[in-house]
Regions:
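A structural boundary/capping signal
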Residues: 1-285
Length: 285
């Protein structure tokens, strides 16, 4: 418990300086320390730094964006051997960056994390993209003319996607036809957004495995990153209820309903609140 408490404190301190010290690697390593309290962060930071220097060298003679992307793909996927884990997609190790570095495999967002770090250091105009169901990377040439931008699928060896490809993926991921709205479906994800989505992936996995305490930790970290994430506040309330922490559950669920009005899960949330009242564990106003 002491080790986790220290990791929790370190993550809070990291969040406090995040807008000043722009460091994605530190953040994902702290998430890995949730699982591995004795993780040697310096070892993995040095490994990423070594990869970064190699990427800079590989891209030093490139000029165009296509040349840079091809060189980065050659280094990251072919030379280093990173690839998407399509055999066991929901293995939580795909989300812990230390495991991704050791095993050379991951899911879209964990591979994108490393790809972005290497690309940024090498002068690539890359951004993370919060595409539904499948994190992407964008080369953003211009914020005014999106036709000059490129979309990269790091889960599939850096394949460049057209907007038509992305439209087809959107329909597949959502299970229905929906018009692609770039301003909505292709929103940039800064460091906070990348960490938030990484934690959400782990939260979903651990909740499905019945590891409620782990899912609660991840939810609390998501709230540190985005305090007005009302869905995460609801989840914190539900996880707290499952763990018998009724006062926390009441506070979270009542605040969730207050902030969201009458959400789609209004009845279910009230059912939990009344279940606690029936046990005489809380008082409802």
């Amino acid at each position: 418990m002491e080790s986790f408490d220290q990791t929790n404190l370190d993550f809070k301190n990291y969040i406090g300086r995040l807008d000043i010290k722009w460091d994605l690697v530190d953040g994902v390593l702290l998430i890995a320390r949730q699982q591995y309290p004795r993780l040697n962060q310096e070892k993995y930071k040095n490994l990423v730094q070594s990869m970064t220097q190699q990427a800079i060298e590989r891209l030093s003679s490139t000029t165009s964006k296509i040349e840079k992307i091809n060189a980065l793909n050659q280094f990251f996927f072919k030379e280093m051997g990173f690839h998407g884990n399509d055999k066991d997609y929901f293995d939580p190790r795909n989300s812990y960056i230390s495991d991704v570095l050791d095993r050379k495999e991951g899911i879209p967002i964990s591979l994108a994390t490393l790809y972005l770090v290497l690309g940024w250091a090498s002068g690539c105009k890359l951004h993370g993209i919060n595409f539904p169901g499948h994190f992407l990377v964008e080369w953003r040439e211009s914020t005014q003319d999106s036709s000059q931008n490129l979309y990269i699928d790091v889960f599939n060896a850096g394949k460049i996607l057209t907007l038509k490809d992305i439209q087809e993926r959107l329909n597949h991921n959502l299970g229905s036809e929906q018009k692609l709205e770039p301003a909505f479906h292709l929103q940039s994800a800064g460091i906070r957004g990348i960490l938030h989505r990484t934690l959400n992936n782990l939260k979903v996995i651990h909740a499905s495995q019945g590891l409620t305490d782990r899912a609660l930790w991840e939810t609390e970290w998501m709230l540190l990153l985005k305090s007005n994430d009302w869905n995460s506040l609801r989840d914190k309330g539900l996880f707290s209820y499952s763990l018998g922490r009724y006062e926390v559950a009441q506070q979270c669920l009542e605040t969730y309903l207050e902030k969201t009005g009458k959400p789609a899960d209004y009845a279910q949330v009230w059912q939990v609140l009344y279940a606690m009242k029936a046990r005489n564990t809380i008082n409802l106003n």
